Amino acid sequence: MDEDGNLQISNSNYNGEEEGEDPENNTLNQPLLKRHRTLSSTPLALVGAKVSHIESLDYEINENDLFKHDWRSRSKAQVFQYIFLKWTLACLVGLFTGLIATLINLAVENIAGYKLLAVGYYIAQDRFWTGLMVFTGANLGLTLVATVLVVYFAPTAAGPGIPEIKAYLNGIDTPNMFGFTTMMVKIVGSIGAVAAGLDLGKEGPLVHIGSCIASLLGQGGPDNHRIKWRWLRYFNNDRDRRDLITCGSASGVCAAFRSPVGGVLFALEEVATWWRSALLWRTFFSTAVVVVVLRAFIEICNSGKCGLFGSGGLIMFDVSHVEVRYHAADIIPVTLIGVFGGILGSLYNHLLHKVLRLYNLINQKGKIHKVLLSLGVSLFTSVCLFGLPFLAECKPCDPSIDEICPTNGRSGNFKQFNCPNGYYNDLSTLLLTTNDDAVRNIFSSNTPNEFGMVSLWIFFGLYCILGLITFGIATPSGLFLPIILMGSAYGRMLGTAMGSYTNIDQGLYAVLGAASLMAGSMRMTVSLCVIFLELTNNLLLLPITMFVLLIAKTVGDSFNLSIYEIILHLKGLPFLEANPEPWMRNLTVGELNDAKPPVVTLNGVEKVANIVDVLRNTTHNAFPVLDGADQNTGTELHGLILRAHLVKVLKKRWFLNEKRRTEEWEVREKFTPVELAEREDNFDDVAITSSEMQLYVDLHPLTNTTPYTVVQSMSVAKALVLFRSVGLRHLLVVPKIQASGMSPVIGILTRQDLRAYNILQAFPHLDKHKSGKAR
């Protein structure tokens, strides 16, 4: 961090490029493992646009005496309440996500619609300079609102939010990411940014909004106005909140694309680390509720009760009426689309990585620089969208088409702009409209001559530039729609170039181009395939869409990481990948533990003074609890106790005058499982008198007696798979052979210890051939 608290982004290599060779690598006399420095890490990361202190979540079940008693004593009615509440909250997540998505679409379509109508009025009167001033002024005002809200009220609302959601579901606590203020700023900011014509989508923000709704419902509302309903005590834990947020993220994708199955698969393929069949059902239920809500509002809006909205804002690029015909010869252009998508997607990721580093340097200068950067991008975007159509030639209207040509309204495929009657400006049709309508226009079918090649090249080049410079400014933003716009442009260009040599409609080429670029950048296949099928409502596209997605992902993977992985790396979020690096098999957890400070342990019945000293002088979040040695059994590892539980003991002053074990009823009288699940306790709020320092605490009833342990000879690769698969926060390392007088636990590993980048800092010669992607 610098002096102003801004995070300095790491310069470590993110795509595994070769670095300079160390001359010691060729020396046979060097030891196999050369320890360079102590294993260490930073607990800071960017959450949205805010530098935050990062901790891990407790997804593991804490099997202490209280939990076991609570589990045994639950009645059938309580079990039914728990299950019923799970499904009720899943329904409410879908309901509120659908309602808020409709609100956002209504606002965006009406604000942008009236803005474009005003601009069209001045253009029709040949008052182009006035039209430009109105267009630019409105966009600057909307951008200013979105940016100021993010910069000054909720920095965590910046960006799409999907990388932070991935991190949360991976086990990383992202502070303030799902708060009420963040959600409200995300809603209003998304409306402002998208209505301002910025090259941003509302799809990523909707995923974040759905997750915020899920988190708020699970905890009973905002922190200051939380509902104290006793049923909600069942959800006062990280495991159930994780499941709810998974439902929320799937509902957000469904609300963005009206794709219920695609939303479920997106959550499974992209954001969720841990999955099971019961969660699949609830997630699908949430997305089904979203679709019902959206369908109901579409019926209402189609009757003209939503202003300029209609059904336009609820994205549906319907090409179901298009006859899909392709033959063996079409495999060549389809393959080219996939290859182009992979190459351009990886190139886009690489360039965006550089732009985000540059923006980080600008943002470090202060809040006003963040606002000015957003306004500068908005000004550039507005001038380009309004000015570039003057470069296009006017095209005569085709009398054989059924649509009105030319048009001067807010939508339509044939905008007149500066052309005489009977002619239209094809580039204006793509630029002077909302992003959703631009995609509909470029996806239009049975219109082989609607867009000229020059206009498509200008459109493609512009949105490549806008896609790079817009993402990263301090506004809520999504990547889906900008990538769709770029991909559909080069797809349509290829279809236009093929002309009569192909049987596939140019609009379908645009769909395939959009799919290929998304796969080349985001590296998703199954979920994207289903999303595009539900988006276009044409099942006949399935075979060639699958083919294009597989090629694009394969080509993209050969160059660099996916865009969300790159953003995770830039933000410094300690995300654990599913596949360990190959060199991790050459290192054992015992050797890794040797690079850490000695483990801090507590006795089963511990003195208050010792507990206070440990909490004051360490930042560890868990401590092994040992029972004293005797001649027959030696030292026993009783379990693991969390820092939060120690703080609760001190706050409640559950002290003993003598060193003894407590009875079961004594702990139940003082604590409940619900209290132990809360995470708000802070040691700084604890005040212990000098006389209390000499008292004792029995830690046995609050200790997790079944922590996960690994023997010190296990490879780091195997330990990483276990850590990630089970969703752990702490992993105890035990000796292979416990000698007399030796501690039964030799260390604790956390997610920071298992990150490839951190390991290579302590063991720089492990990765001799740079075979992995150190993060």
UniProtKB/Swiss-Prot annotation:
It is a multi-pass membrane protein. GO terms for molecular function: nitrate transmembrane transporter activity; voltage-gated chloride channel activity. GO terms for cellular component: chloride channel complex. CDD domains: CBS_pair_voltage-gated_CLC_euk_bac, ClC_6_like. Voltage-gated chloride channel that could play a role in the regulation of nitrate content. Homodimer. Interacts with PP2A5. This is Chloride channel protein CLC-a. It comes from Arabidopsis thaliana. The lineage of its organism: Eukaryota, Viridiplantae, Streptophyta, Embryophyta, Tracheophyta.
